[in-house]
Amino acid sequence: MIKIKYSLIYIYFSFLLLIVSTSLFATPNGKDLLLACEHSLDKGFSGTKGMMCTWYVTPCDCFQSEDSEIPRVCLPPVPDVEALAREVTEGLAATPELFNKSADVAAGVILEKSFPCTDEL
């Protein structure tokens, strides 16, 4: 009886550890980005939501390989973060199929239309 009890406790804690470790390494998706950018546009680009929105709407065109799932985006030297956030927010609202993509892929798909990279790597 005691062995069964300890086995159940072990299984329970293993399951909890799996859930916690999965959520610790989860990356934001397009829906998360939409919510963060809507909040940022409404309340200002501060806090974690502001940082998240800014990070994903200003992608760096560095370390992009030809087989990368993340589209290449070439922004101007001094990008307007608010305008980029608005463009990504509108693009996500109009394209809900991007909600389940990672935030960097979703933002890249939207921004590559306005800011394509014309030169080779």
Which role fits each region the language model picked out?
Residues 21-23:
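N-terminal signal peptide c-region/cleavage motif recognized by signal peptidases
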